């Protein structure tokens, strides 16, 4: 049975919610799924003053954990059109795995959030995907089999490069049913691909 890691960073809980949806989809496909998060870099007093969501259930991942999975699905919020420093710091430590080719052939995917529709969703997805390709991974996005990608009836995240959500400038908007559906769909497709490749 394929093993899937949903690895994320979430300051305010939006990506945590998306990560849970991605994991639901992967489990639906029959994979064994773990959800883990990367370490926080912001000092606790500043994170608390900034109203970060610090009570997240997922355990903290280590870089060595990456070797134990057939698929790794990475989610993080957007900072100025790119991945957060927390996720970048974590992935930058995977040089040893990269040098040994440990991640070659594993399946990967990306998901993100932005404050607005035009806040850098696709550039952030590409910054995750670039890491996955350097690791030698097989990248799977959110294909148009998910009909919610083409909706014009609502403000909605989502891209063929990965599931996304829009949070609003103050973070008040939570992932919509359509966005969560996209996350579940992507998780399922990635897990199905991992099962085909790795059993």
UniProtKB/Swiss-Prot annotation:
NAD(+) binds at residue 12. Belongs to the WrbA family. One of its GO terms (molecular function) is NAD binding. Keywords: Flavoprotein, FMN, NAD, NADP, Nucleotide-binding, Oxidoreductase. This is NAD(P)H dehydrogenase (quinone). Substrate binds at residue 98. Its EC number is 1.6.5.2. It holds the Pfam family FMN_red. Residues 4-190 form the Flavodoxin-like domain. It catalyses: a quinone + NADH + H(+) = a quinol + NAD(+); a quinone + NADPH + H(+) = a quinol + NADP(+). Gene3D superfamilies: 3.40.50.360. Its cofactor is FMN. FMN binds at residues 10-15, 78-80, 113-119, 134. InterPro entries: Flavodoxin/NO_synth, Flavoprotein-like_sf, Flavoprotein_WrbA-like, FMN_Rdtase-like_dom, NQO. GO terms for cellular component: membrane. HAMAP family: NQOR (MF_01017). It comes from Rhodopseudomonas palustris (strain BisB18). Binds 1 FMN per monomer.
